[in-house]
Amino acid sequence: MSLSEKGRTYVLFAIVVLACALGSLTQTVMNSMLGGVEADFGVNASVGQWLTTIYMLALGITVPAVTFLSQRLSLRSVVFLALGLFLVGGIVDVLAPTFGVLVFGRVLQAVGAGITLPVLQSIAMTRFPKGQNGTAMGIAGIAMGFAPNIGPLIGGALVDSWG
């Protein structure tokens, strides 16, 4: 059974909304984990702060570059690239033996998240019928607004559970 064009749009939209929410979540999860991460890697607060700063910096640089990618790759390829970078970045973070590798993983995550943000808006504005664009953007806004608010809670729970 194959999905209709409308069904594929909804599935794609849901995947990208979830990816954007996870991108926002990982940005704020680190805030409550920073002290533990600094202690684990033996770095001071000014060095440890790079984990949050580099994420925002890489995200900010990536967003404008997505137009270039979108003109050269299919939407599907761009979404897979974003999800792949985000996933690989997360794996690198979990397995990071050194602080530098952890920072590199955060950059990969941020680039993946940075790709999803404009793609989400593009899907909402071009793949949905004219009357549903606002609803699609509203759904995206709810997810994007909710995720950063629970990030510190999740980060705190992770630190309490695993140190």
Write out the residue ranges for each language-model feature.
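Transmembrane-helix bundle of Major Facilitator Superfamily
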Residues: 1-163
